[in-house]
């Protein structure tokens, strides 16, 4: 009897679980060719954009003490910053909203993938804050999530 996997609910497979399995035996904090092929098979072209963010060291983990709450901040183009909640399956980038939530073209955006990959290979900057700064940091990052080029529309 064949086993059927339910793929209708994308939340059944979590990004963190996928990457932990792929890197389970990786003790070198590097990405081997075999691992890269596995990542490409799962995430397609998005993996290359994610790796570029890691190479440019654009991922920072904000950790709040004493609660140990955290989220990732990924720097984007033109001063934009995006907040990623890996456990909460959220990113404040436009691609997450459009491609992941609305169109369902992707399961994860490049910022989510790069955040957890950077953590796994120990290539993430960490900044610690007091818990009292949690809300203000979120508001600060969210305000920078919408720094997109303005478009001027011509009236006819």
Swiss-Prot record:
> What ranges of residues constitute the SWIM-type zinc fingers?
82-120
Where is the major localization of this protein? nucleus
Q: Name one GO biological process term.
A: double-strand break repair via homologous recombination
Q: Which domain of life does the protein's organism represent?
A: Eukaryota
- Say yes or no: keyword Nucleotide-binding present: no
Q: Name one GO cellular component term.
A: Shu complex
Q: Name one GO molecular function term.
A: zinc ion binding
Where located? Nucleus
What keywords are annotated for this sequence in UniProt?
DNA damage, DNA recombination, DNA repair, Metal-binding, Nucleus, Zinc, Zinc-finger
* Matching InterPro entries: Znf_SWIM (IPR007527)
> Which family is it part of?
Belongs to the SWS1 family.
Described by its record, this protein's role is as follows: May be involved in the homologous recombination repair (HRR) pathway of double-stranded DNA breaks arising during DNA replication or induced by DNA-damaging agents.
Protein name in UniProt: Zinc finger SWIM domain-containing protein 7 homolog
Annotated source species = Dictyostelium discoideum (Social amoeba)
